[in-house]
């Protein structure tokens, strides 16, 4: 057996090997050690190898999916070695000692999952292949759980943004690329494949073969890099399926001109689909997700990741949202019907992958039925939006398949097909007869129990069944002697503690009839299952289109529901360079405030070609960063086809969105906080066009004051004069306000704050003009800095402001300030203070624990009287 294991393990390469033994998948050697640690299961041993025990652990087959999920989450890949013949077939082939044949039937990786238990129903599961041809790059991406398949040709500079958009579960790349220092951290944890797996001509040939076409012209013109990426992707899928490819829809070629460009840094800072902690909660998608199906949630995430550039398509989406927005009853009816709709795309994915079950077929039947009910409800409506007219035909045309599945399957089929019982009565008369025969035999067996009790006088006699003995008679040990007699008519089979088991000729005959009928019935049902799956897969493209249409309907109705509940409005999206928002709100922050019973302070934004750059000043915590992000998110929502949180909004098409907000570092790539800031700012200045929207927060703060001011000054000028884009620029450098005299499209704005009875009140309101001060020390007081530090800061600030007013050398004046030591401390805590005196008199080394406790209480009383600390 171990020889067979070694052979299979060699094929598995870097994967853990699940080796089937009976009802368990066993792991050996280092695989066992690694798996037992991850799964927290017992590590045992079996036999020896080179005079050492072989480590072993195992998981039951019926629970294998849950264990697989944990291993995949831990970053493992698992090869499944299953039995490919029965023990009976093995004996027939090689005698009683023949080893059952096993083979690797599948390799399970993070990007090749199809099982419902292993996937997040509300998130896509992308497998991405990266390839390079010359200076060009290509990506090929597939979600095999739904069949989605897309490619994109891109430059090296856009690689990070596309990988960030897809948020792939698994990335594969040529070994020559991954091993280059420049890409090790840009393609993290990529699976290395040999360079031969990324061959452009071979990729083209594979595509033609899969879709049975002679030319790719109907799909578009693929670049060499795209075809190489396709080849790598299909090679990995071929390995994972051991020669069986999953369902893939026709590849969709993405073009940058079709979607708003959002780089990786901007996606992260705006938290579009994941918070800074990497969770869905707290992100934009989580705050606006009112979808009721997993497919709808996945499409919503995809839409937010790629806002549209086609105004006509944006308007079509907005029209459908508005249609549901104003018809409450229709919206609620549609959403109720969608709630009961199965995930057709993932059901189809399992069927194509060969892992479909009778339950999956019933889900498909019910889902297509729901689609037709929706069709009937929506088709008769007047003044339907164009997008609804476009997707409605995909809801119908499945009648023959639904009729077949309704006739063939019972209402609630089991997941496990091996025990039969899922084909409906009346679908196959021969099957019905076998079931009848089996039923008669089982009834006869039940009657035999009463007969044997009467014959033997043993009232506790029972007829039982198990997988080893089949049907048998069981009596308590004290009654066994009578049945042991040669003329009793019973044959001894097994003796256990407390019971003895027997057989009888009549029981044996009936058992054979029941077993044969059952085996034949299961065989017939298995054939029917295969035929039903084959008939279903003939309609795979139509089913996939229906699934996509249901998801689009769910997203649109969900947008409408969100807009109604949160008082959002339809934006006007046009080809101008305006950005005019009345009473706009931050969708995520407002959502959090509403939950805590607070109100979000709305603000206006008005950018146009003559007033396209706002310089925003004001205190920390005043809401500058929130205001910046809020407007960026409004652009994303509008071009996604959603209503927006505002009273009114007109948004000129944004081709590229950039955000330089928040401080972070990238130690893995050797970059400090300031270096990251400069790299991101450089990307903005080199890529932003006059149609872009840019938010910049505190540029230059990561270095010395004068260096930072100089950089910020130059960046403002470049954004104004060279990029000429719409930009919100938040800063604490008040010197930048002088630029209004030189830059005609720049205007000054600030977030309002006021002092009330010695406290700082942050109003979170935008107003014209520059802030008169930054209120930094007041914010520090709100944050809880010690009074002694605040006092010292006030002294330093006063000296700096005084020297600035006199236009003197501030460094010379600062040298006159006392050091932040005893002298500075005494300016806050004079020596004649009782608390100071009490502390000075202490001899800490001579105190007992009791004395120390008494002194603590005394000091607390003194502090209460004289609120110094």
From Swiss-Prot:
BP GO terms, sorted: mismatch repair
Any one Gene Ontology cellular component term annotated for this protein: cytosol
Superkingdom to which the source organism belongs: Bacteria
Pfam families hit by this protein: MutS_I (PF01624), MutS_II (PF05188), MutS_III (PF05192), MutS_IV (PF05190), MutS_V (PF00488)
Gene3D superfamilies found in the cross-reference section: 1.10.1420.10, 6.10.140.430, DNA repair protein MutS, domain I (3.40.1170.10), MutS, connector domain (3.30.420.110), P-loop containing nucleotide triphosphate hydrolases (3.40.50.300)
Ligand binding (ATP): 618-625
UniProt keyword terms in alphabetical order: ATP-binding, DNA damage, DNA repair, DNA-binding, Nucleotide-binding
GO molecular function, one term: ATP-dependent DNA damage sensor activity
Keyword GTP-binding: no
Protein family membership: Belongs to the DNA mismatch repair MutS family.
Role description: This protein is involved in the repair of mismatches in DNA. It is possible that it carries out the mismatch recognition step. This protein has a weak ATPase activity.
Entries under NCBIfam families matching the protein: mutS1, PRK05399.1
Name this polypeptide is given: DNA mismatch repair protein MutS
Lineage summary: Bacteria, Pseudomonadati, Pseudomonadota, Alphaproteobacteria, Sphingomonadales
């Amino acid at each position: 057996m171990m020889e067979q294991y070694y052979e299979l393990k060699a094929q598995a390469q870097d994967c853990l090997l699940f080796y089937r033994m009976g009802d368990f998948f066993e792991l050996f050697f280092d695989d066992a050690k690694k798996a037992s640690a991850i799964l927290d299961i017992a590590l045992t041993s079996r036999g020896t190898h080179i005079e050492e025990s072989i480590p072993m652990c195992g998981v039951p087959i019926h629970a294998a999916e849950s264990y697989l999920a944990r291993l995949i989450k831990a970053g493992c890949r698992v090869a499944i070695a299953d039995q490919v013949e029965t023990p009976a077939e093995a004996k027939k082939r090689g005698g009683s000692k023949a080893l059952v044949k096993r083979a690797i039937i599948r390799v399970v990786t993070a990007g090749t999952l199809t099982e419902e238990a292993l996937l997040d129903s509300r998130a896509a599961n992308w497998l991405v292949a990266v390839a390079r041809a010359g200076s060009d790059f290509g990506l090929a991406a597939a979600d095999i759980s739904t069949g989605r398949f897309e490619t994109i040709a891109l430059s090296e500079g856009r690689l990070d943004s596309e990988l960030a958009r897809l948020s792939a579960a698994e990335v594969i790349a040529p070994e020559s690329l991954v091993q280059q220092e420049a890409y090790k951290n840009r393609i993290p944890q990529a699976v290395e494949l040999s360079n031969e797996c990324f061959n452009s001509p071979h990729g083209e040939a594979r595509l033609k073969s899969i879709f049975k076409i002679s030319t790719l012209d109907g799909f578009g013109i693929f670049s060499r890099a795209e075809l190489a990426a396709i080849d790598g992707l299909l090679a990995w899928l071929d390995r994972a399926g051991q020669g069986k490819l999953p369902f893939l829809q026709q590849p969709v070629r993405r073009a940058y001109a079709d979607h708003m460009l959002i780089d990786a840094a901007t996606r992260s800072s705006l938290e579009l689909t994941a918070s800074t902690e990497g969770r869905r909660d707290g992100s934009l998608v989580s705050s606006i997700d009112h979808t009721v199906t997993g497919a709808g949630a996945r499409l919503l995430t995809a839409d937010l990741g790629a806002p549209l550039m086609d105004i006509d398509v944006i308007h079509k989406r907005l029209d459908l949202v508005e249609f549901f927005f104003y018809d409450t009853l229709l919206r609620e009816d549609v959403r109720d019907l969608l709630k009961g709709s199965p995930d057709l795309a993932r059901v189809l994915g399992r069927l194509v992958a060969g892992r479909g079950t009778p339950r999956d077929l019933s889900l498909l039947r019910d889902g297509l039925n729901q689609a037709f009910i929706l069709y009937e409800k929506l088709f008769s409506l007047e003044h339907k939006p164009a997008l609804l007219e476009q997707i409605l035909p995909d809801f119908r045309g499945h009648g023959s398949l639904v009729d077949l599945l309704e006739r063939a399957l019972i209402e609630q089929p089991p997941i496990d097909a091996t025990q039969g019982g899922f084909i409906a009565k009346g679908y196959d008369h021969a099957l019905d007869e076998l079931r009848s025969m089996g039923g008669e035999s089982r009834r006869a067996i039940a009657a035999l129990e009463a007969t044997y009790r009467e014959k033997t006088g043993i009232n506790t006699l029972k007829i039982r069944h198990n997988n080893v003995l089949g049907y048998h008679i069981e009596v308590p040990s004290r009654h066994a002697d009578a049945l042991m007699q040669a003329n009793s008519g019973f044959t001894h089979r097994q003796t256990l503690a407390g019971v003895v088991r027997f057989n009888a000729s009549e029981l044996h005959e009936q058992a054979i009839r029941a077993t044969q009928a059952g085996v034949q019935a299961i065989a017939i049902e298995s054939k029917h299952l295969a035929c039903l799956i084959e008939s279903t897969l003939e309609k795979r493209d139509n089913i996939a289109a229906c699934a996509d249409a249901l998801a689009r309907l769910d997203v649109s109705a969900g947008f409408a529901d969100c807009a109604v509940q949160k008082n959002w409005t339809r934006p006007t999206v046009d080809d101008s360079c305006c950005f005019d928002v009345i009473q706009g709100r931050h969708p995520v922050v407002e959502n959090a405030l509403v939950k805590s019973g607070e109100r979000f302070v709305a603000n206006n934004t008005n950018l146009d070609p003559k007033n396209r750059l706002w310089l925003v000043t004001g205190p920390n915590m005043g809401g500058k960063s929130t205001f910046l992000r809020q407007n960026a998110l409004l652009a994303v929502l509008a071009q996604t086809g959603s209503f927006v949180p505002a009273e009114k909004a007109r948004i000129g098409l944004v081709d590229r969105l950039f955000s330089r907000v928040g401080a972070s570092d990238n130690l893995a790539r050797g970059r400090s906080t300031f270096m990251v800031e400069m790299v991101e700012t450089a990307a903005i200045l080199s890529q932003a066009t006059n149609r872009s929207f840019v938010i910049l927060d505190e540029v230059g703060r990561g270095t010395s004051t004068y260096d930072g001011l100089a950089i910020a000054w130059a960046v403002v000028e470049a954004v104004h004069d060279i990029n000429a884009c719409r930009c919100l620029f938040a800063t604490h450098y008040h010197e930048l306000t002088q630029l209004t005299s030189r830059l005609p499209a720049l205007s000054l704005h600030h977030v309002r704050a006021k002092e009330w009875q010695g406290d700082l009140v942050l109003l979170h309101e935008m107003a014209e003009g520059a802030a008169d001060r930054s209120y930094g020390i007041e914010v520090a007081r709100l944050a809880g800095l010690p009074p002694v530090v605040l006092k010292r800061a006030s002294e330093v600030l006063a000296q700096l402001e005084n020297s600035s007013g006199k236009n003197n050398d501030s460094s010379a004046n600062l040298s006159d300030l006392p050091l932040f030591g005893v002298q500075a401390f005494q300016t806050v805590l004079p020596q004649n203070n009782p608390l100071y005196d009490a502390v000075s008199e202490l001899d800490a080394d001579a105190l007992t624990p009791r004395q120390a406790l008494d002194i603590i209480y005394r000091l607390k009383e003194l502090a209460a009287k004289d609120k110094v600390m």
